[in-house]
Amino acid sequence: HPDGSLRALMRSKHERIAESISTNGGKTWSELKLTEMPNNNSGIESLTLADGRHLLLYNHATGRPDKKDGWGRRNILNLAISDDGTSWKLVGTIEKQETGEYSYPAMIQTSDGLVHMSYTWRRDLVKHVVVDPAELVPGESLSAEGL
């Protein structure tokens, strides 16, 4: 972040993505705090782009109350963007199928500026998707409300 702070986003069993912040280069971290972004105890991936914006690849779903581990369906995989790492807007839905499962996302930005995403596709394959961040248009604001 421009102020030198570090923000770590992580999965949680509490139906929201959790975060911790360091203001001393990672020597110490704040207590975990739940964000507004939904999470069903599934893996997430965040990336700070070369232009300073942030991307988040995650399952847009909350957990199942009947499961003590918090896991829920992983049939929606969203890509979100943020200017500050706190407020997120939908860029697009990468996958959405009633019976699908899309999990364990990963992202990198290569020297040509493109963002490469990979994730498990229906627990069968690993899918690779490439996007140009210059073409990403923020849409609606995202939160777990209404899920």
Which residue ranges define each predicted feature?
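Asp-box/BNR beta-propeller blade signature and adjacent active/binding-site loops
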Residues: 1-147
